[in-house]
């Protein structure tokens, strides 16, 4: 089985480049206070997301190691192939579960961010309002990138499941296996592209939020 087998790409889906701020200082107008509260809640609501990212990364590393072990074997080790493939399938199912939990965290964050946008619309100071709109624009792009990334990751998971089921087929041909690996690799390539965009927009949002807080007269320091 190992001769001529294509390697499957590993993937680390977009790590959230989180920046949490502690605010001290003057109290702004009510819309600013409301906006600040919502933005801080957004960060809190994404803490489970960050934990799920770590779990997914660990599962991905383990699953990739299992895959590498499988392709080193030949059909004389069929029972071992089945055992490792089943273990990999269990791992994929766990990733699917944790992806759903990650999605839930982002959905809650996005819902809270809508509250922040409503508060921003009521800010009277045009300069500060413009800063808030810039932050909101980057956050929207960030959520869009995550949505695309998550959707593609779900497809990749389905392709992984099919791959490990194929590996248990005694009549599996090298050509058929390579085709499935190529499909999975193509899917993960799209995941990585959206992951990169997600990270870029996260960094831009964090900078825009800092600029917003500065303009609003808050004193900011990283926690």
Describe the role of every protein-language-model region.
Residues 27-100, 104, 221:
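Immediate post-signal-peptide N-terminus of mature secreted/exported proteins
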Residues 15-20:
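Hydrophobic helical h-region of N-terminal Sec-dependent signal peptides
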Residues 22-25:
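C-terminal motif of bacterial Sec signal peptides marking the signal peptidase cleavage site
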Residues 47, 51-54, 61, 90, ...:
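Extended, heptad-repeat alpha-helical coiled-coil/oligomerization scaffolds
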Residues 101-184, 191, 212-219:
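Extended amphipathic alpha-helical interaction segments
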Residues 42-56, 95, 99-102, 106, ...:
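Amphipathic alpha-helical coiled-coil segments
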Residues 3-14:
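Bacterial N-terminal signal peptides that target proteins for export
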Residues 190-223:
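Extracytoplasmic/luminal low-complexity segments enriched in Pro/Gly and acidic/polar residues
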């Amino acid at each position: 089985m190992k001769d001529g087998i294509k390697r499957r790409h590993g993937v680390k889906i977009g790590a959230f480049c989180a920046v949490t701020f502690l605010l001290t200082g003057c109290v702004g107008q009510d819309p600013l206070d409301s906006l600040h509260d919502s933005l801080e809640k957004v960060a809190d609501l994404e803490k489970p997301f960050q934990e799920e990212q770590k779990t997914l990364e660990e599962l991905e590393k383990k699953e990739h190691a299992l895959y590498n072990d499988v392709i080193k074997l030949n059909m004389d080790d069929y029972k071992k192939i089945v055992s490792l493939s089943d273990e990999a399938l269990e791992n994929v199912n766990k990733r699917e579960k944790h992806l759903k939990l990650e999605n839930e965290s982002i959905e809650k964050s996005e819902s809270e961010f809508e509250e922040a946008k409503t508060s921003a619309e009521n800010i009277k100071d045009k300069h500060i309002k413009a800063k808030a709109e810039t932050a909101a624009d980057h956050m929207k792009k960030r959520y869009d990138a995550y949505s695309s990334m998550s959707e593609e990751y779900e497809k990749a998971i389905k392709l992984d499941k099919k791959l490990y089921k194929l590996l248990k087929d005694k009549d599996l041909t090298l050509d058929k296996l390579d085709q499935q690996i190529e499909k999975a690799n193509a899917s993960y390539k799209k995941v990585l592209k959206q992951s990169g965009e997600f990270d870029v927009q996260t960094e831009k949002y964090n900078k825009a939020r800092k600029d917003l807080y500065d303009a609003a007269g808050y004193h900011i320091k990283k926690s």
